[in-house]
């Protein structure tokens, strides 16, 4: 494969992508097809690993999450992309202080290795911070769910309980009512509906249970219901809960990229330019759930493509500027 090799050594790449999910792999394919030298550092911890399938992904609906990533890695390798299995813990700028200096970075891995990059794309995703209720973590991604567009079809017409872990539970309740007429909202000593919301719940024939949820009732490796603090068991086939969404932002923070509270109050994320994912730090991009907490897999993949194209354009601009500088010096030397 023909490729500009001016900056390529065993540990130096034009672009280092940190995170090997849908966003990172899509960016890697885009950059590989642009003849860029690309390294993907992947910790192997996809957010959707507990789920049986990926949904809402055109032509791949229901595919196992790991199979989708395997396919993405194979495609990226076909364009010369390299991979490291490991965890990036920090990065720092190594560019000179003089005006017009080329951007460059060192990326540090947990095992002590360091790789060099001209540009960095962070696609490390987010962590779902689950409510502290017995059974939630064990059933997460199976019959404890959060997104109707990811899981609603699979639990259609079933007995679904909405756990009042955050005020947004009312919004989730109304959404999931589209998939099932058998919806129960558990206020859980957290949610306090307004008069208008009580009216909406009644109009949609949604049951409301007061009191704190103590645990999930699980039998034969299946959810059977929720257990209230009073000991009452409410039979259910699925539980919906909102999570706090926390961007995996350690590398970005080490570079000085600010991490801020999401406008909807659902967690922390990184603000980026919507036209390509550039962060506030020159030479550093972010894509996928680390920037878009609400994005589904296909949206994350799309943001990776956009970021890859933006990074390539940024490199082209720098290379053109440097070529002009060389040409000017050459003409002066004649």
Give the label of every model feature segment.
Residues 70-108, 114-117, 180-268, 313-334:
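A Rossmann-like FAD-binding core segment of flavoenzymes
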Residues 33, 37, 43-45, 52-79, ...:
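N-terminal glycine-rich dinucleotide-binding loop that anchors FAD/FMN and/or NAD(P) in oxidoreductases
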Residues 2-16, 83-158, 238, 266-275:
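FAD-binding core/adjacent interface of flavoenzyme oxidoreductases
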Residues 28-29, 170-172, 287-334:
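A conserved FAD-binding loop/helix module that cradles the flavin
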Residues 13-67, 159, 164, 168-191:
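Beta1-alpha1 glycine-rich phosphate/pyrophosphate-binding loop at the start
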Residues 3-4, 138-154, 245-298:
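FAD-site-proximal beta/loop scaffold in flavoenzymes
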Residues 28-30, 52, 132-135, 173-175, ...:
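Short amphipathic alpha-helical segments
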